[in-house]
Structure formats: C-alpha cells, structure tokens
C-alpha cells in the first residue's frame, strides 16, 4: 500500500530527472573517469533500464548525509560558500559541495591539536562522499572522486581540496587533502575531449577492459545494449541496426 506509493514517487521523480538531462550538451563533472560507453549512451538518449526504487533511496541518502555534514560545518563558521557552480564553458558542467577555510584559532579554540600546519585563510574545495561499508577503506580515495575534485580546483583556481568520506554503515569519517595537480587535470580534460569526438562522430567507445566485473557494470542501466555492442568500438548506426534486428526477431 504505502510501499507502492513511495516507490512510485521515486520512479516518477527519476523519470523527470532523465527527461531534463536529455537536452544536455556538456559532460557532468561527476562523469570524469566513468565508463565512456555509458556516457555515450546517455548523450544519445538510449532508453535506460529502470533503476530500482531502493537504489534511488540510497542515492538520496547520500544527499541527506552531505547536507547534514554541511550544517555542522556551517555552525563552525568555516564554510565560505556551498553548491558552487563551475564557470560556464563548453565541455563540462557541475557544482562543488563547498569551499571552506580556517582561521589560526579554528582548531585551537576547540582544543584540537593538528600535526599538519594549516595556513589561515587558504580556501579548500570540499567534496563530501557517502560510501557503503562494503567498500574497503584501503581503496580510498577512489580515482573518479580524485578526478572530480581536481577539476573543481582547476575551474575555481584553488590550490587545495578535501575529499571527505562518510561510511553509511559505521558513520566513520575519512578525509584526504590534495594539492592541485595540473598534469592530472590535463589528462582528464583530454579524456573528455576525446570522448566528445566519439559522441559527435557517432562512434560507440570500446567496452571497459574488466567488463562485466567492473563495479559500474554490476547494475548498469545499459547492460543489455552494451552486450549487443560487443567488446570493440562500433558505429552508432550499425549498433542501432543490430538492435532493430533483435527487436524484429523477438516479435
């Protein structure tokens, strides 16, 4: 009864979100380093498999955790801005969770002794990520998250950033501080540029090397069409013809 109503709410909200995303012309910054084939299919408006309401609620929980942490940090007076959109440009769009900075008394007034030296007034881009307890903490920080943070540092012209992870199961917090890495940013931007060329030339990218064991493959919304496309690059027009043939055979 209530379950059906709640599930329907999440499914309809996700459909509306996808409708809005269909008109996009730029990459989302969170896609840095993600599966190129998945991104290609999203740009080509390929019908995606429906995401289970349970997973949608998990995604929402991550947003709730982010807001909760930001409220705590705001109360400490260290947050300078939240939900900051990167400057408009042709390739990428996105917004950072927050920019924070500290005074020389931020920690001492609370009786906190830090081993590392904190420079007063220096801004840090903050990205908050919630993770499952199934993720081995030794694997943190995740490469995709590092790519995303480095792009924020690049577009905001800020030299330092913080990746803050909160384990949803244990509530343990882990943080990593990064300096701006120009070489990494150039590699990521080049990766995006090459993917844009494939999208514009209608070339479906190669499958992930560790398919189907990569974590992105486990519940991918394009798993069936990815199987049809095969391992190597394929023209988008040829793939569409392959899909049409299979649809005709199934009728």
Question: Could you say what each language-model-derived stretch is?
Answer:
Residues 1-125, 132-134, 143, 240-244, ...:
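Metal-dependent nuclease catalytic cores that hydrolyze phosphodiester bonds in DNA/RNA
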Residues 128-130, 165:
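Residue-level recognition of conserved beta-strand positions in structured domain cores
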Residues 141-155:
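Short, charged, amphipathic alpha-helix that recurs within catalytic cores of restriction-modification
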Residues 69-73, 77, 153-156, 196-199:
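Hydrophobic, Leu/Ile/Phe/Ala-enriched alpha-helical segments that form helix-helix packing faces
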Residues 35, 152, 220:
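A residue-level signal for conserved active-site and pocket-lining positions in enzyme catalytic cores
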Residues 121, 145-148, 188:
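Amphipathic alpha-helical interface surfaces
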Residues 138-140, 155-251:
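Metal-dependent nuclease catalytic regions and adjoining charged, substrate-binding loops involved
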């Amino acid at each position: 009864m209530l379950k059906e109503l709640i599930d329907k709410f999440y499914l309809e909200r996700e459909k509306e979100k996808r409708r809005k995303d269909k008109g996009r012309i730029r990459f989302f910054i969170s896609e840095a380093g993600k599966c190129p084939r998945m991104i290609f299919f999203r740009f080509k408006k390929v019908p995606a498999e429906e995401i289970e309401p349970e997973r949608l609620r998990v995604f929402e929980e991550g947003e709730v955790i982010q807001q909760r942490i930001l409220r705590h940090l705001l109360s400490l007076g260290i947050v300078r801005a939240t939900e900051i959109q990167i400057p408009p440009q042709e390739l990428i769009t996105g917004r950072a969770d927050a920019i924070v900075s500290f005074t020389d008394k931020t920690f001492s007034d609370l009786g906190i002794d830090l081993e590392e030296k904190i420079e007063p007034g220096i801004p840090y881009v903050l990205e908050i990520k919630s993770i499952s307890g199934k993720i081995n903490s030794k694997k943190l920080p995740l490469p995709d998250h590092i790519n995303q943070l480095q792009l924020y540092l690049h577009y905001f012209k800020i030299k330092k950033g913080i990746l803050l992870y909160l384990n949803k199961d244990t509530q343990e917090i882990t943080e990593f501080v990064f300096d701006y890495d120009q070489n990494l940013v150039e590699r990521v931007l080049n990766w995006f540029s090459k993917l844009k060329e494939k999208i514009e030339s209608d070339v479906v990218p190669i499958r992930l090397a560790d398919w189907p064991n990569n974590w992105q493959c486990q519940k991918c919304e394009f798993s069936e069409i990815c199987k049809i496309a095969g391992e190597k690059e394929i023209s988008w027009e040829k793939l569409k013809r392959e899909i049409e043939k299979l649809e005709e055979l199934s009728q």
